[in-house]
Amino acid sequence: IKTMADLKGKRVSWVKGSPALNGNMAGFLAFGGLSWDDVIKVEVSGYGASANAVINGQADASMGSSVSSIFNKTNASPRGLFFPPMPHNDEAGWKRAIAVAPHFAKAVVTNFVGSSDSNKSFEGMNYPYPIFVTMEKTSEDLSYHLTEAVMENYDQFKDSGPGMDGYQLSNQNFSWIFPYHPGAVKYYKKKGVWTSKHDKHNANLIKRQDVLAK
């Protein structure tokens, strides 16, 4: 298995009660022009069992973070470990993937189990995690000042853990899948990074939420 398309007819772990993991795998399959109907679904009980199914020869692929500790075990096993890439110039593949998993974003993956001097990176995907979320009833003042505190104090916590660069102002994605709170929008407008295009996108997301709520 070297590409997502190579998963056709293969055994793929399907985690009971985990729409997040299975949804991400559906996005990977879609990139290769496939769906769950094109693979052999191997039902497993959890995240660890998903990777162990590959190690034990019960499955050929599983979904997980590229830095997940369980993959160290996979990498050391006779079966080995490989992350099929998602070439960023494959426009058709990305269109299919995003149609199924709209939270996917292109990313050059440099932190993964099994990396080496001859295998330092690959073109794949990522998505913001963790993120700040709140309820619509949260006050605009609180949302504004929390956003301001995170953005303005980034230099003080940027080295506190992996993935902190996601809290940098220049890395914010204003056209993603969740609507922004008015307080956050107020701050980003003050910084000059929020445009009318983002207003339109945000309004559409709020409208979509209203429809789903009904």
Tell what function each PLM region has:
Residues 12-17, 134, 149-151:
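Short acidic/polar alpha-helix capping motifs at helix-coil junctions
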Residues 66-69, 73-79, 83, 96, ...:
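An extracytoplasmic/periplasmic, membrane-proximal ligand-sensing/linker region
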